[in-house]
Amino acid sequence: MVRKALKIRGIVQGVGFRPFVYRLARDLGLTGYVRNTSEGVEAEIEGPARKINTFLKRLVREKPAASRIDRVTLKILRPSA
């Protein structure tokens, strides 16, 4: 199991980005949370490394058309389970 914290900056609020992140994680069977912050969107995801890598690739490739990702900061966390 792998757990990562993400900070996503760019045009990621008011464009359906947070619900997109939630659905993507749910569809891949990942757990965690996603929320808006004053600087963008923050999320934590946890699951098998392969699925987290898929999540990160799809996050950029399938993002909402009106969104723009300028920067993603990743931090590895200790798995909760």
Language-model features: where?
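Intrinsically disordered, low-complexity, mixed-charge
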Residues: 1-81
